[in-house]
Amino acid sequence: MKYRDLREFLNLLEQQGELVRVKQEIDPYLEMAEIADRTLRKAGPAILFENPKGYQMPVLCNLFGTPKRVALGMGQENTQALRELGKLLAFLKEPEPPKGFKELLGQLPQWKQILNMPSKTRDNAACQQIVIEGDAVNLYDLPIMHCHEEDIAPLITWGLTITQGPHKKRQNLGIYRQQLIAKNKLIMRWLSHRGGALDFQEWKATYPDKPFPVSVAIGADPATILAAVTPIPDTLPEYAFAGLLRGHKTEVIKSISNQLDVPASAEIVLEGYIDVNETALEGPYGDHTGYYNEQEYFPVFTVTHITMRKDAIYHSTYTGRPPDEPAVLGEALNEVFIPILQKQFPEIVDFYLPPEGCSYRLAVVTIKKQYAGHAKRVMMGVWSFLRQFMYTKFVIVCDDDINARNWKDVIWAITTRCDPSRDTTLIENTPIDYLDFASPIAGLGSKMGIDATNKWNGETIREWGKPITKNQQVVQHIDELWDQLGL
């Protein structure tokens, strides 16, 4: 499924019955979030609210509300194909030189895909058809959703934030929520380890008296949005990876007020700066954990320009107790993670992030165990190999006879193969999601690893239990009789 911008993608979704246009007047205050939540929970379509109460601009919600639509957005036909995408990312993360001509030929499809990666800069673009600047800038003209009753203010949720460190050639793309506090001001809530925050810290150290340039794209094409949340190698620009997903180069254009590249087809672009000394108290907001989070000070983004397409579409979402869009994204990207992990740890059979674990807080791993202590090595590998799992609080490791995606299997393994004292690993003072109020200190908490594998010599001195198996001849015979038994 190939497309060039968000509108073309929406047309394709509509043709497949994956998009519904709502013509009734719907309020961005609470009503849109309620409709989107109900729709997502029944795996319903993307929604285009064509008549937002009090606004002229339509609002797009639930775009990535099913794993299938995430896969389509990444240029794949289904979630199974995301495994192949993960293999390509594993190849890009650690490319190995071919061992011979035959292997070189086998790698040609991968290198052909890589040719689509560099972005293409345009001189003019749809995202700058309308330009608003200076005193005319008014963020209250945008139909920014207010998702939960106790949220402090409307919140931009799908803004693609573009930044660049003072000593870096690569520009960073990230998704950070932004609280509306004035007609030209937003609070930029980014965690300290995220790319935008790192760029900002480097800028502050280099230019302590100069404003930090920022651009935010709303309504970019799905490949570019998803590139910003995918575990790509640090050396690979998100625009380049988006080109790979899309099958043709990402088209960008320079921002009007700074040198940052923005998606040429974006619906809306906010341009401006962060004063290195200006912060504001952010929140509380209902978030993906299902709770309202604490308040904290974050940098203030001052918007100097708004550019947009004619008849622009505002792209939004809500977050709440799973399932929500972040949980669905995590479920789909789970398939991308597996080949990347297997590249480093070939013994991994499956890796699963249960959606009810708030996308990433708990992982279940199944392995082909090869030696005593193997499960602990895998735990450490999961926590350290990809930055995405820095905040994973619980890692459960099972043997490959356990289905990682079946809680009945996993609970059976924990209760029959695990001794709490011997098989539980606790690590203190590790990075934890700032939103995790269960941690004793904001941003710092503990992790637990559970070894639910069969124990080898050196791990136990007892005779290990032998699993019960059925006599297959008897099973086959009863299968043949079953319809006659009246049961």
UniProtKB/Swiss-Prot annotation:
Metabolic or biological pathway, per its Swiss-Prot or TrEMBL entry: Cofactor biosynthesis; ubiquinone biosynthesis
Enzyme class: lyase
Disulfide pattern: none
Compartments reported by the entry: Cell membrane
Keyword Secreted listed: no
Gene Ontology CC terms, in alphabetical order: cytosol; plasma membrane
Example of a GO biological process term: ubiquinone biosynthetic process
Domain of life, source organism: Bacteria
Record: active site: 287
Its EC number(s): 4.1.1.98
Catalyzed reaction equations: a 4-hydroxy-3-(all-trans-polyprenyl)benzoate + H(+) = a 2-(all-trans-polyprenyl)phenol + CO2
Protein name stated in the entry: 3-octaprenyl-4-hydroxybenzoate carboxy-lyase
Lineage: Bacteria, Pseudomonadati, Pseudomonadota, Gammaproteobacteria, Pasteurellales
